Design a protein with these regions (language model features):
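N-terminal export signals
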Residues: 3-24
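Active-site environment of divalent metal-dependent phosphoester hydrolases
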Residues: 47-50, 78-83, 101-103, 133-136, ...
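Metal-dependent catalytic neighborhoods of phosphoester/phosphodiester hydrolases
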Residues: 52, 82-88, 105-111
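Extended substrate/RNA-proximal surfaces in nucleic-acid metabolism proteins
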Residues: 102-198, 215, 221-224
Length: 260
């Protein structure tokens, strides 16, 4: 457990701390930390993106390689994994697609299908809507839905699940609500998805209860735990995070204990 906490803190700090990500690619190569050697980062945002990030994908890919990472998958809203692989050999780079409103007002099946057919086939994840999900936009309205009024998975979402199953890639819940995650993972299991992931399952406002987390695990899904909420709370460096709840390492460990 102590080793997990150390590794999680180190990995997450590298992914989300601008201070650790500063510097030019030509800087002296630091010694590889044994806790980072062979790591695969599965949830990171970098430029180019629809909002400003603290680092671009090329610089981050180079730094991950220098630090001994095996691979990195960008959670971006378009992806350039093919070019990054050609530019920075020696590290596996993957991309994905988040089905937000830039692909339409409903989950876009064709966009998901085409993402799996781009040269190299480096799309490894299709996320349900994130910052434009119906759950995130429940106060404003206009979010992209994943369930119908009766709480059933929409046909277009089922088709995306089928695409993920056929391509053997990740179907991720994005910014779906905790209740939606339980329904989505149950349907994904029924469809035959082998790699269903509940996105940042321990981070508010998408944080699952222990019962919901266990239900998703029973549905065959993996729970993704972003280390970002560890850096939230009253002592957060970023002012906007000070009013948001912190998730302690002990809480992370309690989730992981559900499926040791």
């Amino acid at each position: 457990r102590r080793e997990f906490m150390k590794a999680a803190a180190l990995t997450g700090a590298l992914a989300v701390s601008g201070r650790l990500l500063e510097g030019e690619a030509g800087a002296a190569t630091p010694p590889i930390d044994k806790d980072l050697d062979g790591v695969i980062e599965m949830h990171v945002h970098a430029d180019p993106d629809v909002r400003a990030r603290c680092i671009d994908q090329l610089t981050l890919t180079r730094q991950c390689k220098q630090n001994g990472y095996r691979g990195i998958m960008y959670k971006c809203h378009d992806f350039i994994a093919y070019l990054l692989r050609a530019t920075v050999p020696g590290i596996e780079v993957f991309g994905g697609i988040a089905l937000n409103r830039n692909y339409g007002d409903t989950v876009n099946v064709q966009a998901a299908k085409m993402a799996t057919q781009v040269t190299g086939h480096y799309c490894r994840c299709i996320w349900m809507p994130t910052y434009q999900s119906a759950f995130d936009m429940r106060k404003k309205g206009g979010g992209v839905p994943v369930l119908d009024a009766q709480g059933k998975v929409l046909p277009e979402v089922v088709k995306v699940m089928e695409i993920c199953a056929d391509a053997d890639i990740i179907f991720a819940t994005g910014h779906s609500s905790p209740d939606e995650c339980v329904v989505l993972t149950a349907k994904a299991k029924e469809v035959g998805v082998k790699k269903a992931v509940v996105t940042h399952a321990s981070q508010a406002p998408w944080k699952l209860s222990m019962d919901q987390a266990k239900a998703c695990i029973d549905n065959g899904a993996y729970l993704e735990h972003s280390v970002l909420p560890y850096f939230k709370g009253p002592h957060a460096v970023i002012p906007g995070y000070r009013e948001q709840p912190q998730v302690t390492m002990e809480e992370f460990a309690s989730y992981i204990a559900l499926a040791p």
